[in-house]
Design a protein with these regions (language model features):
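Structured beta-strand-rich core segments of catalytic domains in phosphoester-bond hydrolases
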Residues: 48, 106-187, 191-194
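Metal-dependent phosphoester-hydrolase catalytic domains
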Residues: 219-231, 239-359
């Protein structure tokens, strides 16, 4: 049997399960006091860790995540991963639609369609922005947004080119411009900067390059505006908030260290204020690589769209963890550890902030 008929049969067999889950979820959340309301825009980001479809892509040499590949990535494993992700998004959004969800490590429009159109997330009216990028493995950044909350004005990708290495390829920065229901403009950037694979010091120049390119785009928005635009920058930066790329190149300052002339405020510096100690764990150490940064114009009191104080959060429900028998405490419930299939969620925790739109 070919892969496409198998897919159709699998989808039919899952439809009853998804319907029942949606009904149960609605019953469970009916009496929950949501922190979101109609004036709130929840902006979230999540590195979904290798969210691949199981089909061979003849245009790429990297096909580890296929049935015959090294990870033995089958259709049933794909659906398990997809279901884990949508349940997490429902919990993260507290039953209401997220206004913006930045994503990274998604392969293509097939996986985003199966996530947002073939699960209970469909009722939240998400639309997805995705461009095929240059990453060798085929993992991209993407944005899902609620058409009930925001209107898309434009989007584009920002390439990260290394003038010293013409063969260098990495993930794009995704930029989108929105209007909210009050016609307030919101600029969003989604990032997945070069990894530390090969050594932190050996690769730091690549993340600093990404920071320079992003800062140049932010500065161009400011030059084109009469006042500082309302900007949200999110992503897996593969650096901490206090690393040089973030603090001195991008110039994203902690709230307590910002000055009037500073444009960007990093809301994910102090773990004590975020509800959890980090977004990923390496051995015994938690770090904050996944961050959301906003413009000063959102941080200061505003008569329109503004940041809700202390809403920055690392989302850490128990179901995203397992016991860490090697280093103690908890670790993230991943899809794989090396080649060994675990059936979990991701190696990163989601993060979010809330904005308030004043009517």
């Amino acid at each position: 049997m070919s892969q496409k008929p198998k897919l159709k049969l699998y989808m039919k067999s899952k439809s009853l399960y998804l319907t029942l889950f949606a009904l149960v979820f609605q019953c469970v959340t009916f009496n929950v006091l949501y922190s979101q309301n109609e004036n709130t825009l929840r902006i979230a980001f999540w590195n979904m860790e290798n969210f691949f479809d199981p089909f061979v892509d003849s245009t790429r040499t990297y096909n580890d995540y296929t049935e015959d590949g090294s990870q033995h990535w089958t259709l049933s494993r794909f659906y398990k991963k997809r279901n884990n992700i949508y349940k997490t998004i429902l919990a993260l959004s507290e039953g209401a639609p997220l206004s913006v969800l930045g994503m990274c490590e998604v392969e293509n429009t097939f996986v985003t369609t199966m996530l947002f159109q073939e699960t209970p997330l469909k009722r939240h009216n998400y639309r997805v922005i995705h461009y095929e990028g240059d990453d060798r493995r085929g993992i991209d950044v993407a944005i899902a947004y609620s058409i009930d909350k925001l209107q898309l004005i434009s989007s584009e990708v920002i390439k990260i080119r290394n003038p010293d290495n013409k063969r260098f390829k990495t993930r794009d920065i995704l930029y989108a411009k929105f209007y909210d229901r009050q016609s307030d403009t919101l600029h969003c950037f989604v990032n997945h900067w070069p990894s530390r694979y090969g050594g932190e010091k050996e690769t730091i120049h690549l993340r600093e390059l990404a920071a320079y390119i992003l800062k140049d785009k932010v500065d161009s928005l400011i030059r084109a505006s009469d006042c500082i635009p309302k900007i949200v920058i999110m992503g897996d930066f593969n650096d901490t908030p206090l690393d040089n790329s973030m603090l001195n190149v991008l110039k994203a300052k902690p709230p307590e260290r910002r000055h009037v002339e500073d444009t960007l405020v990093n809301l994910f510096v102090n773990a004590d204020d975020l509800g959890f100690e980090g977004t990923l764990k390496h051995q015994y150490r938690w770090q904050i690589f996944d961050q959301i940064i906003i413009s000063n114009s959102l941080y200061n009191d505003s008569k329109s769209l503004r940041y809700i104080n202390k809403s920055a959060t690392i989302f850490h429900p128990d179901f995203l963890f397992v016991d860490d028998e090697t280093y103690g405490g908890k670790k993230l419930f991943r899809t794989y550890i090396g080649p060994k299939y675990q059936g979990g969620y991701s190696d990163h925790l989601p993060v979010y902030i809330d904005l308030r739109s004043t009517f």
